[in-house]
Every structure is written in structure tokens, then in C-alpha cells.
């Protein structure tokens, strides 16, 4: 689907589906401003994914990806084939950290899903192989370009000053991540990956109750564990697989920057889904992204924004 890009502007306002209406984590129905896809993801806004699922991708295609591509087995078609479960994750029975880890791994490995396993291979005393996962073949569920763009998008969750995972980046390594909080603040999630490992952490109670801890304890656990296991590992970067390209874009329109654009930033795009060049500034009076732009003014892979994000904070976002 070549409609959505890093710098696509979408309206941060509630959309409805059946009897459900989107709210952001602050309880509000959105700012009423246009925001980029990247900005919405880093801040964990609910309105933007709901708008994408309902109006752009569609319920059927979204459910197909959830079940048949990402292999989430807990989905219940009768109740989860709907806007809220597919856009913000409010599934009937939730999901597991194992399946979340396997799904998110595709964003860091070029788009491949690998069925999780606990043992590489096991031999008995006579050398007979009892369990063998050495030839575990991956299934390509995303194009290389889509996976690369998603990885760069998710990296801004930890590198942007307004990102909900900015406190939980693995020390010394690029980290793509996504945070999550359920209704009534009963559950906290953090899924994060480096060039070496991917892991999902869930934090909550056996019998759900309000989590009063400040911040995201799941993110804190992830960072503690990942900092420890990466401490003695050699430097390693994510492999760029030539499916995506970094481009300068106009922060007023979301289109590729031209010589007349006075405010620009850098984003990542699939090579076959690059916006056209900007010929005017159509969003300058209706966008709140000007003071919270995504990437540094020079092209770098995971650097924080150069323009001020102080006004944004987590305004309307998840946490």
C-alpha cells in the first residue's frame, strides 16, 4: 500500500467505527492539528493509527496481517476484527510477549517472520537429533523497504525527545521500540530491538489493577536487561538493505523539500514510495509539528530532533 509515508500529514482527531470513538491516552479526542506519521508514532497517539486502519488500510486487510502475517494466535475474529483491536491493540484476550517479540523482529531483519523456538537443536547421548531448528526458514511478511522504513520510524521512539521510549534506549546501540499502555493503566508494554536482540516486556498484575508507578516499568526492565547483555558485545549497526532512502522533506507539507522550503527535516522512504516535491506550504496554519520535528537537520540514522520539542512533551500521547 503506497499511500502512507514518514512525513504524511494526518489529522489528530477522533474517528468513529460502530459505537467506538478513538481517544488518546490523555482522555482527549486529539489536538485537531495535522501531525506526521512519524510524530504520531513517536508520541504514541491513538487517533492516527485508528484513522489509518479505518480509512486507508481497512479492517479486513489489517486483520489479515495480524493473523496471517504476524501470526498472532490470540485474535478472536468475532470481536477483534474491528477498529479498536486492530489500531490500538485492545484485543479480547490480549497477546503474549513471545508473539509480540516474533512480530517485531521483522522490523529489524528486513521483513522476515521466524516462528519462535526455545531450543536450537538437541541430541541424545548417541548423537541422535531429537529437536532441530537449525533450518528454521523465515517467511517474508514485509517488503525490505517497508521493514527498513518501519525500523527507522520505531527508532525515533527512543531518539526523539518527545518519544515515549526516550528513557529506555539500549546504551550504545540503535534501538527500535514501541511502548504500550492499556485502558485504566492496568498494563504496560515495551517491545524493543537492537542489531543483536529483540524482546517484549509486559508489566502488570495477575488480577488487573491500576499501575501507579511513574513512567513505564516495562521499558525500565527492558533497558536494564539489554544494557547488561550488550555490555561486552562489539559495535554493530543495523544492515541497510537498499530498500529505503533518506530524503529531506518540507515540514509544512510533508513533501520532498524544494529550494523554496524554509523549514525541513529528514525522513526515510521506500524507494518506490517517495513523495513529490513541495510546490507550496499548505499546512503552516494547521500543523503543530513545526516545534517538534522528527529528525536532525543533517541526515543521520538515529539522531534526535534539532528543533524544540518542549512544547510537545507527550501531549495527547500514550504516557
Model-derived segments and spans:
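A penicillin-recognizing enzyme superfamily signal
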Residues: 5-6, 39, 94-271, 275-281
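Conserved catalytic neighborhood of penicillin-recognizing serine enzymes
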Residues: 4-62, 125-156
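Extended, charge-rich, low-hydrophobicity segments
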Residues: 20, 38-39, 50-51, 64, ...
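Glycine- and acidic
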Residues: 46-48, 82-88, 135-136, 206-210
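Mid-domain, small-residue-enriched loop/turn segments at the edges of structured enzyme/sensor domains
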Residues: 21-28, 56-101
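Ser/Thr/Gly/Pro-rich low-complexity, disordered linker/stalk segments of secreted
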Residues: 280-319
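Soluble periplasmic/extracytoplasmic beta-strand elements of cell-envelope proteins
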Residues: 9-11, 87, 200-202
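Active/ligand-binding-proximal structured segments within catalytic/core domains
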Residues: 1
Amino acid at each position: 500500500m503506497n499511500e502512507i509515508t514518514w512525513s504524511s500529514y494526518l489529522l489528530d482527531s477522533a474517528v468513529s467505527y460502530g459505537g467506538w470513538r478513538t481517544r488518546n491516552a490523555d482522555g482527549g479526542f486529539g489536538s485537531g492539528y495535522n501531525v506526521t506519521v512519524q510524530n504520531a508514532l513517536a508520541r504514541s497517539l491513538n487517533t492516527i493509527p485508528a484513522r489509518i486502519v479505518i480509512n486507508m488500510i481497512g479492517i479486513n486487510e489489517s486483520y489479515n496481517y495480524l493473523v496471517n502475517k504476524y501470526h498472532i494466535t490470540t485474535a478472536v475474529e468475532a470481536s477483534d476484527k474491528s477498529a479498536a483491536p486492530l489500531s490500538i491493540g485492545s484485543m479480547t484476550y490480549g497477546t503474549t510477549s513471545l508473539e509480540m517479540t516474533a512480530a517485531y523482529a521483522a522490523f529489524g531483519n528486513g521483513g522476515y517472520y521466524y516462528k519462535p523456538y526455545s531450543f536450537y537443536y538437541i541430541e541424545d547421548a548417541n548423537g541422535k537429533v531429537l529437536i532441530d531448528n537449525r533450518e528454521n526458514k523465515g517467511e517474508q511478511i514485509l517488503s525490505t523497504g517497508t521493514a527498513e522504513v518501519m525500523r527507522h520510524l520505531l527508532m525515533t521512539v527512543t531518539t526523539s525527545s518527545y518519544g515515549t521510549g526516550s528513557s529506555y534506549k539500549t546504551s550504545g546501540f540503535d534501538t527500535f521500540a514501541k511502548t504500550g499502555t492499556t485502558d485504566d493503566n492496568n498494563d504496560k508494554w515495551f517491545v524493543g530491538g537492537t542489531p543483536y536482540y529483540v524482546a517484549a516486556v509486559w508489566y502488570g498484575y495477575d488480577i488487573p489493577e491500576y499501575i501507579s508507578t511513574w513512567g513505564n516499568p516495562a521499558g525500565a526492565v527492558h533497558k536494564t536487561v539489554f544494557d547488561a547483555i550488550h555490555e561486552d558485545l562489539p559495535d554493530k549497526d543495523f544492515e541497510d538493505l537498499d530498500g529505503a532512502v533518506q530524503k529531506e522533506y518540507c515540514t509544512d507539507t510533508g513533501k520532498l523539500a524544494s529550494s523554496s522550503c524554509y523549514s525541513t527535516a529528514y525522513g526515510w522512504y521506500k524507494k518506490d514510495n517517495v513523495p513529490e516535491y513541495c510546490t507550496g506550504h499548505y499546512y503552516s496554519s494547521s500543523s503543530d509539528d513545526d516545534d517538534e520535528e522528527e529528525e536532525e537537520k543533517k541526515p543521520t540514522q538515529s539522531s534526535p530532533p534539532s528543533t524544540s520539542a518542549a512544547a510537545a512533551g507527550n501531549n495527547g500521547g500514550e504516557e
